[in-house]
Swiss-Prot record:
Species of the source: Corynebacterium glutamicum (strain ATCC 13032 / DSM 20300 / JCM 1318 / BCRC 11384 / CCUG 27702 / LMG 3730 / NBRC 12168 / NCIMB 10025 / NRRL B-2784 / 534)
Coiled coil: none
Assigned GO CC terms: cytoplasm
Task of the protein: IGPS catalyzes the conversion of PRFAR and glutamine to IGP, AICAR and glutamate. The HisH subunit catalyzes the hydrolysis of glutamine to glutamate and ammonia as part of the synthesis of IGP and AICAR. The resulting ammonia molecule is channeled to the active site of HisF.
InterPro entries recorded: Class_I_gatase-like (IPR029062), GATASE (IPR017926), Imidazole-glycPsynth_HisH (IPR010139)
Protein name as catalogued: Imidazole glycerol phosphate synthase subunit HisH
GO MF, one annotated term: glutaminase activity
Length: 211
């Protein structure tokens, strides 16, 4: 059975690139900002390009933060890409502007501590083992990044009653940052799987199979 993915249209992100990649991975894609469509699809993908503050304003204009929260409360899968991952955290701090995020994870998006920014191009990950997100992907695969900001500290506390998220790290120069998170029905990547060749295509297939 073909899975339906709502690609959230809130004025940010390369929708066509993401749509084509999802369709190649086997999904039926609906580009929409309609709350009913986005809430009822099998999966919701949240893209994002640009500044954290601008993306949050666009998201709130279409009630995207509520859509994300409602889906997760009901156990329905959501995936964020690039700034679409960043806005899932508590706060963004860019160019001196502090903005509240969706608050699904604690933590702050801040400027990377590196000489050369943006971090643009292909990079490896500290690849996890036994991860549904990275199933079928070689540990030495590279993924495509374009960003100057990221989450440099993971602060979510866990206990014996909950399954801890799978947090995947990468490094630009000597600065380590969160490259992906697999947290039950909430997946997210700082890199662009839709621009990451065969490895990115496999990751999207893994997500579609999961939903």
């Amino acid at each position: 059975m073909t899975k339906t993915v709502a690609l959230l249209d809130y004025g940010s992100g390369n929708l066509r690139s993401a749509q084509r990649a999802l369709e190649r991975a086997g999904a039926e894609v609906i580009v929409s900002s309609d709350p009913e469509v986005c809430t009822n699809a099998d999966g919701l993908l949240v893209p994002g390009v640009g500044a954290f503050d601008a993306c949050m304003k666009g998201l709130k204009n279409v009630f995207g933060h509520r859509i994300i929260g409602q889906r997760l409360a009901g156990g329905r899968p959501v995936m964020g890409i690039c700034v679409g991952m960043q806005i899932l955290f508590d706060e963004g701090d860019e160019h001196g502007i502090k903005s509240a995020g969706c608050g699904e994870w604690p933590g702050k998006v801040e400027r990377l501590q590196a000489e050369i920014l943006p971090h643009m191009g292909w990079n490896t990950l500290e690849m996890p083992t036994n991860s549904p997100m990275f199933e079928g992907i070689s540990p030495d695969e590279r993924f495509y990044f374009v960003h100057s900001y990221g989450v440099r500290k993971w602060t979510l506390e866990t206990d014996d009653l909950t399954t801890p998220p799978e947090v995947v790290w990468a490094k630009h120069e000597n600065d380590r940052f969160v490259a992906a998170v697999e947290n039950g029905t909430l997946w997210a990547t700082q890199f662009h799987p839709e621009k990451s060749g065969d490895a990115g295509a496999q990751l999207l297939r893994n997500w579609i199979n999961y939903i």
